[in-house]
Amino acid sequence: MNLKPTILLFTILFLKCATFEVNEETERIVEDAVMRALDSRASENSESEQTSQHIIVSQQANSDSKSAQFTGEVLEEATRILVREFGLEILPAANEVIERWRNEEEELLQSSETTTTTEHPDPTRSKRSAIFRSKRQANRRCSSPPINCNNRFHTSIRSITGLCNNRQNSDLGNSVSPLRRILGAASYADGLGRIRTRSVNGGELPSARLISNRIHDDRNNQVFSPSINHLHMIIGQFIAHDVVFMPSSVARDGGALDCSACNSPQRVSPNCAPITIPRNDPYFNTPCMRLTRALNGQENFGVRSQIGQNSHFLDLSPVYGSADCEAETVRSFQEGKMLTFDDLGYTLPPQNANDSNCQSSAPFHCFTCGDFRNSLHPALIPVHTILIKEHNRLAEQVRVARPRFNDEQIFQLVRKIMIGMWQHIVYNEYIPKYLPRRTIRNFALRPLRNGVHRGYSTSVDPSISAEFAGAAFRFGHSQSRFDFPRLTENGRPAGNYDLGNDIFYADQMYLTRIGGWEPVMNGMVRMPAMKSDRYFSFGIRNQMFEIRGRNGSGVDLVSINIQRGRDMGLFPYIQYRQLVGLPTVTSFNELNTTFSQENIQALRNVYSDPADIDLYVGIMLEEPLSGGQLGPTASFMIGEQFRALKRGDRFFYESIAEGTDNFTQEEISELRNKTSLAKIICTNMDFAARINTDIFDHRSRQVACTSLPQLDIDRFLR
């Protein structure tokens, strides 16, 4: 690979034996750097980082993530001190020191489960320990599972946070834990964390908005998918909300950063990365578009690292939450059921009058769910609602069949069943709609017809990859329509809403005269999505987070995706080609095996060298594989991720893992044979009599809801 020299140097130095030995002198040097970083942070004036206006933050950091940012930024500054004074060679030894300190803190934390004191007798150690976040520190007031993974709790119950899913490495896949990198390294200008701004030829990289305008504008290319419906896009977004949540950096006071100004990296925070808007832009009339860098949660000396705030597993985080306190806000604690809002004659999630992102005024409150992005746009709430209703329906069945079960027993059993159903839907219905059979076969993603999956391994890291989160799984943004049609139960039009006018507005859910959210669900099932290609709808490209009546107050999501890749240190597109078996590229012409001539020319018009092509742009312009919706690079990254989520999840619905209360073979068969998204939708809509047999194909023939098999709860009552 043709890596930049600074990146190659950093990688080589980490692979070489450390020049510095781990001894008292090294520990003194490391401790001095950490103390200086702490002192520097304490002395800096935080007033400039406070925002002066309300900013919508879709990736809002919770208390644990803010704690992780504190740790990450101290380690980031300490890294720069060490590298400046001793060179990159000291970092391996420094990380051995920091690992020992971390282990000491973990032991202290575990001992606190049986003792009442966690005081540090050594003042220096007490100060040093401040850089380590205590797991679930913010949730001490909530009920939390034991930290010890050998506790019986972790045998039978999947923790809300993902803690102890892997009992040998308790943090793998846990909420507020680092993303992994497919290539094992990052592409930053300085090898550590500064965003790349220069071309390999020495000039400036093109602005993300310039790329979006020239390559991704759909004005003359609005093509609908011939088969895939709009629900496929929404379920894809729901999956993304389940496993991907990269919180944005916050100001020192914990508030949102205002990164709107072009000079905000200097005037507000180095965690600002505004996007230059070209002159005479067709929509925006400001010089820059706001973007806050993803929160730095690095846990060692070295490269900046992003974190996943939700658990990394397919565990219905949007329904149940990924933090213990978060989980308690959605439960009724009666009969194992979830909270709902039922005052309008139909069911919605509970209202949230304190949602800081909500743009609609009372009484049109946004909602409380396991993921606070639930009200991002009106099409998400129907999915949240049917899953909450399905949980409560099953909980009622368990209550009747087992009257002696208490609230916790009912809740945990139904949650386990719901997650099993969800995983089956993802692997059996969603994935086959866009990945070709060959990719599904190569990554062993297809559910088994019978028997159990014995591929679980503690050595498999289920964590979400930076490439999946920052590029590959964002392909669904191309599927989004500008308009979201509403249909009656008989398929008659009931109006529509525009995506760009309804970001974090909930009033569409309160239209009682047409049945609230059900017409939105009908429209998603029966209407096509946009074709997955390089073109994006007007709302996606211009109006994300726009305030009604204020044109240009939002952002371009495509520009954000491109700039986010640079922020995350993703390598340019061509560095990933060899990974998926494609030939190396040194000229634009050599892209002709995976790109159309039209798309190659589009790239030439923006980039000066193929080595500059951003990963997101590259994967969106690749020609789709036969039988699939995506090209080879995105297909590989998505297939690799879902394989990791299957083989690295001890509680995966088809798996049998030692020391784990997995589903029995009979229960697995029940899930395989009777779970379908169509049935869940049918069962939990008041006015649904017929449904598509293929739930993600808008052309599919419809059948009576009563003809679809229903899960038998008795099969799960041992």
UniProtKB/Swiss-Prot annotation:
Protein name in UniProt: Heme peroxidase 2
Q: What happens when the gene is disrupted?
A: RNAi-mediated knockdown results in reduced survival in response to infection by E.faecalis.
Q: Where is this site: Transition state stabilizer?
A: 373
Query: Span of the secretion signal?
Result: 1-19
- The superkingdom of the source organism is Eukaryota
Please list the residues that bind Ca(2+): 242, 311, 313, 315, 317
Q: Which family does it belong to?
A: Belongs to the peroxidase family.
Q: Where is the composition biased (Basic residues)?
A: 126-139
Coiled-coil residue spans: none
MF annotations from Gene Ontology: heme binding; lactoperoxidase activity; metal ion binding; peroxidase activity
Compositionally skewed regions (Polar residues) per UniProt? 45-64
Primary localisation category: secreted
Record propeptide residues: 20-146
Its needed co-factors are: heme b
Native organism? Caenorhabditis elegans
Q: Where is the active site?
A: 241 (proton acceptor)
Q: Which UniProt keywords apply?
A: Calcium, Disulfide bond, Glycoprotein, Heme, Iron, Metal-binding, Oxidoreductase, Peroxidase, Secreted, Signal
Question: Which segments carry the region annotation Disordered?
Answer: 41-64, 108-144
- Assigned EC number: 1.11.1.7
Answer whether the UniProt record assigns the keyword Protease to this protein.
no
GO terms for biological process? defense response to Gram-positive bacterium; response to oxidative stress
Disulfide bond positions:
149-164, 262-272, 358-366, 682-705
Q: Which reaction does it catalyse?
A: 2 a phenolic donor + H2O2 = 2 a phenolic radical donor + 2 H2O
- Entry-listed glycosylation sites: 354, 551, 592, 662, 673
Where located? Answer: Secreted
General function of this protein: Peroxidase which is involved in maintaining the cuticle integrity in the hypodermis and pharynx. It thus plays a role in conferring resistance against Gram-positive bacteria such as E.faecalis, S.aureus and C.diphtheriae, and yeast such as C.albicans.
Describe, from its UniProt entry, the tissues in which this protein is expressed: Expressed in the hypodermis and gland cells of the pharynx. Specifically, there is low and transient expression from the distal bulb of the pharynx to the anterior of the buccal cavity. Whole body expression levels increase upon entry into the dauer phase.
